[in-house]
């Protein structure tokens, strides 16, 4: 083997290059062509050739462009937001604009709060309270306990509230029916019955209208003469006619009841004055008195207004259960 010296380069800190001779041992059998090999590249050139070059893709370009626009928009938005905040935070200008437009902020805030409160109250008021009972549950339970003791069975009605509600509603419907019938009877009692007597002659209708007009004129003249002091009102004839009606009704009632007692509502309530005026002897008064009952006379039915005991008894007579004692006591009270 033969040794051969080859120059080598080393870099120093001062930037100068020193050439060294390195001894290389080469085999003797090697051909001369091996000595003519190309010089080797250093490590940096090998690394550059080893790494392949990557071309930029189209999606990467778009992403980079979008990121740049987003960053620029953020920066611009920050600047615009600060400018708007500075403009919006100027209270004097805003108040001046609102006042010039005729807007009151306090009233608007109050209106907004009131609408919110109203909506909340409406939502809370959706729940409808239950219907209050007609009778108090405690009173109903006590009464039912008394009835249960007489029937020799015990039951706690306070726990079963449905039974108490059912009894209260039943009593309410029962009393409502009785009161409705009583009101209907009272109205029919006070209302006159219209009877169709057939076709009337025109002559009779004309004569009746003439008589009614004459009586109205005579009564008008009589009132004028009494007001002027020319005649005095006759009380005796008026009271005598009403007394006769009361007596006749009392007699009819006694015959119906079979006793000598009289109804209190049939007794006369007219008090005669202590001093009765002297009978007038005027011409008009004598003509009216002479006519008497032969003339036209209008009289209202002597019926009590509203609901009376007999209306209630008539409504109870159509009931079958639990009304016999009440009806007998009611008629006894009317007789007394």
UniProtKB/Swiss-Prot annotation:
A GO biological-process term: positive regulation of transcription by RNA polymerase II
Region (Disordered) residue spans: 1-93
Basic and acidic residues bias: start-end ranges: 76-90
Residue ranges with Polar residues bias: 1-15
Subunit and interaction comment: The 1.2 MDa TFIID complex is composed of TATA binding protein (TBP) and the 14 TBP-associated factors.
Domain Histone-fold: from-to ranges: 141-209
Name used for this protein in its record: Transcription initiation factor TFIID subunit 4
Keywords linked to the UniProt accession: Nucleus, Transcription, Transcription regulation
GO CC aspect terms: transcription factor TFIID complex
Family: Belongs to the TAF4 family.
InterPro entries the record matches: TAF4, TAF4_C
Location, primary (coarse class): nucleus
GO MF annotation: an example: RNA polymerase II-specific DNA-binding transcription factor binding
Function: Functions as a component of the DNA-binding general transcription factor complex TFIID. Binding of TFIID to a promoter (with or without TATA element) is the initial step in pre-initiation complex (PIC) formation. TFIID plays a key role in the regulation of gene expression by RNA polymerase II through different activities such as transcription activator interaction, core promoter recognition and selectivity, TFIIA and TFIIB interaction, chromatin modification (histone acetylation by TAF1), facilitation of DNA opening and initiation of transcription.
One Pfam family from the record: TAF4
UniProt subcellular location: Nucleus
